From Swiss-Prot:
The chain crosses the membrane at residues 13-33, 40-60. The gene is Kncn. Residues 110-124 have a biased composition (Basic and acidic residues). May play a role in stabilizing dense microtubular networks or in vesicular trafficking. Pfam families: Kinocilin (PF15033). Signal peptide: none annotated. Keywords: Membrane, Transmembrane, Transmembrane helix. Residues 90-109 have a biased composition (Polar residues). This is Kinocilin. InterPro entries: Kinocilin. Coiled coil: none annotated. Its main location: membrane. It is a multi-pass membrane protein.
Amino acid sequence: MDIPISTRDFRCLQLACVALGLVAGSIIIGVSVSKAAAAVGGIFLGAAGLGLLIFAYPFLKARFNLDHILPAIGNLRIHPNSGPDHGEGRSSNNSNKEGARSGLSTVTRTLEKLKPGGRGTEEG
């Protein structure tokens, strides 16, 4: 039961599905009262956006020569700045532990301030 379809007809059907998803998502979000209904509309919009990306990918690939760009993007690495104290003979393991303790004490102080009757909520 295979029905032959031309590439042009397939692209038109694909674009029609994207347009239907955008319209349906916009209408659902526009008339929704609850957050759950708005979330469903957002799912429709996200699916339509993905469909649009799939639709446009061959054109973008031909226009911007993505075969050279995508591997370069994949090779990017993010290296956090190492602190100046690494050169003073301290191991990075100790500095990471001290940084975690410092962050934990900051969080603990903040939580103490937020507690009812805590140190930061004293009334004078």
